Amino acid sequence: AALRVKGNHDFGTTNLLQQLITRALTSGAYEEHVQQLRKRYAKKASAMMAAIQRHIPEGVKWTQPAGGLYVWARMPARVKTALNSKLFKAALRQKMIYVPGNLCYADDPTRRKPNREMRLSFGSASIKNVEEGIARLGRALRRVM
């Protein structure tokens, strides 16, 4: 009995969980769920891009997401995005936070990490909060640009 219990812990998932996953995959429930998520995230991505058009000053470049949950931005050369930057501090004062781009790169002694990029996520935020967050980022950017 002890070997059977140990085997369940060492070699994978329980039979019940495997059966549930099989049913979700073969019934179409999983694909239906993925389609719902895609629609939800597409709406959030569109909301973020529309908010960027309304609130972000000229000179900031943005990616148009073709997938995933992030929008990447590149600031003009004079604006840095690191944790100790004026922009990061201004964003915090606006009660808004972004991920500095330099935190998203692997350490590589042969390459410098970019210091004027940021990553914004629309994955867990509501559309209302996406709009408000981009408006706050716009105010922070205007203070430092």
Q: What are the functions of these language-model segments?
A:
Residues A1-M145:
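PLP-dependent class I/II
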